[in-house]
Curated annotation (Swiss-Prot):
It comes from Arabidopsis thaliana. Its cofactor is [2Fe-2S] cluster. Pfam families: zf-CDGSH. The keyword Transmembrane does not apply. This is CDGSH iron-sulfur domain-containing protein NEET. One of its GO terms (cellular component) is chloroplast stroma. Binds 1 [2Fe-2S] cluster per subunit. Gene3D superfamilies: CDGSH iron-sulfur domain, mitoNEET-type (3.40.5.90). SMART domains: ZnF_CDGSH. Homodimer.
Length: 108
């Protein structure tokens, strides 16, 4: 899995062509549009090697100050309610033979 572009402080590092048109000296006063695109490369799976002997990798963290008893956070990046999990990993796991699951924050 590789990251195509990422930001560091106020700078921008990237691989490939810029996804925006940079502002040049003749375009003073125009706002510069910036976009960072991050894309996973490789096979269809999100989890290539972690705990592959389990049907679904789910980790739980106990936290004392939460408003709900349990809060699932997405780790497959496919949730329509990101960063919260909506169960999209189930379809992804079936289609790709993967075993990614949510991070569960539990109230103590």
């Amino acid at each position: 899995m590789a990251i195509i572009a990422s930001t560091f402080g106020t700078g921008l590092s990237y691989a490939g062509e810029l996804p925006f048109k940079p502002v040049t000296g003749g375009e003073v006063g125009r706002k510069q549009q910036r976009m960072v695109v991050v894309r996973a490369e490789g096979g269809g799976g999100i989890n290539p090697e972690i705990r592959k002997n389990e049907d679904k990798v789910v980790d739980s963290v106990v936290v004392t100050e939460l408003s709900k008893n349990i809060t699932p956070y997405c780790r497959c990046w496919r949730s329509g309610t990101f960063p919260l999990c909506d169960g999209s990993h189930v379809k992804h796991n079936k289609a790709n033979g993967d075993n990614v699951g949510p991070l569960l924050l539990k109230k103590q």
